[in-house]
């Protein structure tokens, strides 16, 4: 993770067709009293990844954050950027501290990748702002 100071606003690219992703971004936006986060739905019909300098396939595979100066953070690093942008709370501070421990960080990276790869299969999808139930896991 880059240790440079944050450059706000952070553009948060999230999958609006993923119920869990949508719920989490809404929760983060509610806590963002200073307006540091700008949520961009990659499932919107007019979304164009290349307009932001991002790879279209990769941005659909994992969460991305782009800082105001163009730095790109993905996966767990993207979550850390969000947590840093929000008012400090004990739970976020604990998560960020634990993620400095290499084995825990590796585990978090693996867990995130598994979630990202299977999010629609596990949690269903949304269409026209209405979420559909998840398909049974077989």
Q: What are the residue ranges of the model-derived segments?
A:
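Generic secondary-structure microfeatures
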Residues: 16, 25, 41-43, 67-69
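Short cysteine/histidine-rich zinc-coordinating motifs and their immediately flanking basic loops
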Residues: 30-34, 138
